[in-house]
Amino acid sequence: MDLKGKKVTLHDMSLRDGMHAKQHQISLDEMVSIATGLDQAGIPLIEVTHGDGLGGSSLNYGFPAHTDEEYLSAVVPKMTQAKVSALLIPGIGTVDHLKMAYDHGVSTIRVATHCTEADVSEQHISAARKMGLDTVGFLMMAHMISPEELLAQAKLMESYGANCIYCTDSAGYMLPDDVSTRIALLRSELNSETEIGFHGHHNLGMSIPNSLAAIEMGANRIDGSVAGLGAGAGNTPLEVFTAVLDRMAVNHGIDLYKIMDVAEDLVMPMMDQPIRIDRNSLTLGYAGVYSSFLLFAERAEKKYGVPARDILLELGRLKTVGGQEDMIDDTAMTMAKALKAAKA
């Protein structure tokens, strides 16, 4: 693989996807400290919201330590070169949330839908483009449909005004060939000025190989997270990925030592538990389950006595998707009843 001379934009997720691993409990001081460190390390894009995006604060998804407005108000004014992005999932976030983010200085909005539901993004993408925002169509759980079906959904988002389309491996299920076929098709069939991005999770240990495959096939925006802080086994660990890109002579603009120090000195000390591939996060990738389901399944194990990995495997069989967090408890309860009946 020869990537020498290619240029990529790295986008940090530790303060948004990392919210899942922290049960949305990141303090304002932690948020500002990490964002400032990322800014000084040269990270050009930093995502800041509730783990489930703007408006995510709810009983279903979890209540954060602070509101999106408070996080954005604290972070945006401190940035010297980095731009701040926000995630918005239609049905959770609204156009009013989008306007709030714009008013608070967000430069990039990423409108995220399940990979088959791009049509629900039209209002939000159109509104973002009218505001002059860098507007990304973010197709989640992209492993669940064929490359051709993904392209059709991407074309919808592009037609609404998205200037960048993401292939999103929300479950950490994909292997490099899965990424290559999808990214190659998107690159060849979307408008040449439309950027292509990839968002990976490390549940099968494939986040770096998958991200490299995406770059090889034409993606120029790659998501990652310092120290991998994110849902499941985390996102592509940015400090590791930066070192790999250095080795491959890819242009990325990040100071390796500084990003290593942010990971080691700021992010790792605030982790509630190590971000690693354990039996439960591995099951997420193996079964193709939405990565943010991990902590929900582990809580259900304590509540119902059913192993989390068995719950996750069943959720994979049921083809659950993001937004169906309520099914985790229902599934665990049903499995517990079946186990009890089998023992009777």
Swiss-Prot record:
- Entry EC no(s): 4.1.3.39
Positions annotated to bind Mn(2+): D17, H199, H201
Q: InterPro entries this protein is in?
A: 2-IPM_HCS-like (IPR050073), 4OH_2_O-val_aldolase (IPR017629), Aldolase_TIM (IPR013785), DmpG_comm (IPR012425), DRE_TIM_HOA (IPR035685), PYR_CT (IPR000891)
Q: Name one GO biological process term.
A: catabolic process
Coiled coil (residue ranges): none
Catalytic residues in the record: H20
Q: Does the keyword Transport apply?
A: no
Note whether Iron occurs among the keywords: no
Give me the reactions it catalyses. (S)-4-hydroxy-2-oxopentanoate = acetaldehyde + pyruvate
Output this protein's name. Answer: 4-hydroxy-2-oxovalerate aldolase
- Origin species, per record, is Pseudoalteromonas translucida (strain TAC 125)
Q: What is the superkingdom listed in this entry's lineage?
A: Bacteria
A GO MF label: 4-hydroxy-2-oxovalerate aldolase activity
